[in-house]
């Protein structure tokens, strides 16, 4: 998925001892920002640049003052950034929010605000393809509508369908009516087809509503239990 949201999300995916994502900050140069989907997420700098490329929002002229101040990779605390900016509180708050939401500013593991390297890794369309492809590979099976919901509507449905078609042509995905008693068309990772035949889930865990898997399964949970955001116990 190109990042991790929280310590709890990490705990479900790592066997043995682990630390909070921020504790890996210096070793892996992790940053936190509003990635895609639009959650506060820890990831490495390269992935953050790709997310920024995909979002493709240029900073407004009035925001460039903050960018110039936060250019060091160590970043600046919010209070120090405000003090140096010379801006009034409301303008500073709005400018900081715009830059953070667009990934022109991110936060270091210590919580300081910093910029990312200015050079692109991908052009916007290619960056969005990369982001969507990795998201699909993470979950394994998606419908077009479910993918749109998973991305919180950030990428237009027409573009998502174009990406799904491209992944079909590249023989990464295959499609079909894969869910019992459902007329919804699904795409699944081609290489997974042989591995999942005859397999049933075994084990138990609590799926926290802050986990992206909970967002992925939210419609199924709503249909089965009539509930919105909630923690779900899986056991077999």
Label for each model-derived stretch:
Residues 115-183:
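Contiguous mid-protein beta-loop-alpha structural module that forms a pocket-lining wall or clamp
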Residues 1-91, 97-107, 227:
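Phosphate-backbone binding and catalysis cores of DNA-processing enzymes
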Residues 58-63, 117-140, 191-210:
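Short, amphipathic alpha-helical interaction segments positioned at domain boundaries
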Residues 64-68, 83, 158, 162-165, ...:
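Polar/charged alpha-helical tracts
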Residues 174-235:
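Non-catalytic regulatory appendages
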Residues 90, 106-108, 144, 175-176:
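A local structural micro-motif
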Residues 75, 141, 187:
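Short aromatic/basic micro-patch
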Residues 33-52, 96, 107-125, 178-192:
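Accessory beta->alpha helical hairpin/"wing" motif in late/C-terminal subdomains of nucleic-acid enzymes
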